[in-house]
């Protein structure tokens, strides 16, 4: 549903006339017939009725999820209106779950690494979008699988944003791409051991995935 709020919502009661059948309409000025409107009463999710003075006809809803507020008017003689008015309030008190990141490989590779990001839901208003950041750069809306082909270590971060603007925690993974061959720094012939085979000692280094 639409109309989600972040932390709380204030429901204001108004309207109603003392005819025995009128109901609050949430907008009209209170009427004053018969013994007059004494106060409003409201019920939360079908619970007990609670009084609410005309001078401060509000109730604040903070419970997460959907809350149904039902209201009626009570006159000076204690008669409650035969009809009621109902409103639904939607509160999202928490950020979405942290999204998941899947790499095509989490080991060193000389090929392109693909990155898939999946939101893990939101308990209330729902996930509006997921975003990613590469190597600490700006956040970008995620729409399709990412490809990382450049040499080196690359940090992929992801977060989710729900429909009231709350931001999840951040997930991160590192893509490891090594496209540089090892460097041979020295080749030595081992001392002649009297065998017919020659032995060579090779010293090589690789700054990324290693030799």
Regions found by a protein language model. Name each.
Residues 1-211:
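Low-complexity, disordered linker/stalk regions enriched in Pro/Thr/Ser/Gly
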């Amino acid at each position: 549903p639409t109309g989600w709020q972040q932390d709380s919502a204030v429901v204001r009661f108004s309207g109603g006339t003392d005819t025995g059948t009128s109901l609050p309409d949430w907008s009209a000025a209170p009427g004053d017939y018969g013994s007059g409107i004494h106060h409003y009463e409201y019920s939360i999710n079908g619970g007990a009725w609670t009084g609410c003075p005309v001078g401060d006809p509000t109730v604040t809803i903070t419970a997460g999820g959907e809350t149904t507020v039902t209201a009626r008017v009570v006159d000076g003689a204690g008669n409650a209106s035969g009809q009621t008015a109902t409103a639904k309030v939607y509160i999202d008190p928490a950020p979405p779950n942290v999204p998941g990141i899947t790499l095509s490989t989490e080991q060193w590779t000389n090929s392109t690494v693909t990155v898939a990001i999946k939101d893990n839901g939101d308990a209330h208003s729902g996930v509006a979008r997921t975003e990613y950041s590469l190597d600490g750069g700006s956040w970008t809306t995620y729409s399709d699988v990412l490809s990382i082909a450049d040499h080196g270590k690359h940090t992929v971060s992801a977060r989710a944003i729900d429909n009231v603007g709350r931001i999840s925690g951040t997930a991160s993974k590192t893509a490891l791409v090594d496209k540089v061959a090892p460097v041979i720094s020295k080749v030595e012939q081992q001392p002649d051991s009297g065998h017919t085979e020659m032995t060579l000692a090779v010293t090589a280094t690789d700054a990324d995935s290693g030799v």
